[in-house]
Amino acid sequence: MPEMFRYCGQVFQVHKRAHKTCDYSTQYPYRTRWLANTVHLQTRCDGEAHDGCQAGCLLYWKSAWLKPLGKRRDSNDRKGTQAPSFPGIVPVRSQGCNETAIWDRIRVTDPVGGSLTYICQMTQVRQATSALAWWDVRQYLEDYTSGNVGIATLCKAFAYSVYYHLSQAGIGLGPAMRWFYDRVNPLRGGTLFPRKPGEIPEGSPTPSGLLNLRPGELVRVKPHLEILKTVDSSNRNRGMYWDAELVPYCGGAYRVLKSVTKIIDEKTSRMIEMKNPCIVLDSVICRARYSPCRMLCPKEMYPYWREIWLERVEGQAGDGPSAEKSMRLSVREDRQGQKTIPQLEIKR
């Protein structure tokens, strides 16, 4: 995509191996799909070439577009077009392209209705991937062997998944298991049971709150139980879903990264203009810990927050974790037992 051009020639460390990724083009619950020969670097799309889409998606990089440091070749060396070899990634030979062709493919206008649709990495996930069953154990082995997550994170994710499915099995254990989770897990530094329904009856209006937040302001995420008072029994506030992946951030203090008013819808490939702006918080990402059909997905999408779920913090952060501390702790936890991650240069 044109948004990737500015990274060419720069050096980055591999952030995650993108052997699987979430597919948001289908109906909920979303699922993961296999993705070959791809990694994530710490690079995000700024949406400049896609009419200012503000989703800020983590970019996918094919191995053919990268080369390991220490193995640079002269630009006149034709062998330099060969894809590098990384552990667990099958090299493929590039077929070639040019910037004009890329620019020509980012917008498509319907010749009949005149509606505009967009082509980007996110709208093409289904075309670039293959089906992956949530129970396919190979994906979890690669989560660990690739260095995406450590053994502790993997075990915690499996433990929660088993616990959750037992609580939902309809054998009469659900209420007791959720009560036990709420009493014991906070003693271990964890959260309340993350998948609780909202308190407002479905179909009833949900409240709004307006803080007029600006980038750089410090906010605190309200407690989980307080947020449940603002969402209906399907966990939505004016259409926006309150997801279990947001629960670990409750009580934490974070900087506002941006206010989001428009994004490209991955289902329709059309630009969505939001009726109510939502907030993205710095260093706050989806870690796919509590989503059984997409567990440990490395996509790291930015979650969206209603302002009514946040409260402005005057001065410095309080007793909740800061964004920087939260990110350091989560990365450290994710990467316990990881192998050394290589640095790569993006080809020009």
Task: Give the label of every model feature segment.
Residues 1-87, 93-97, 101-185, 189-215, ...:
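Basic/aromatic-rich interaction segments and small domains that mediate binding to polyanionic partners
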Residues 216-220:
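Generic structural signal for buried aliphatic residues
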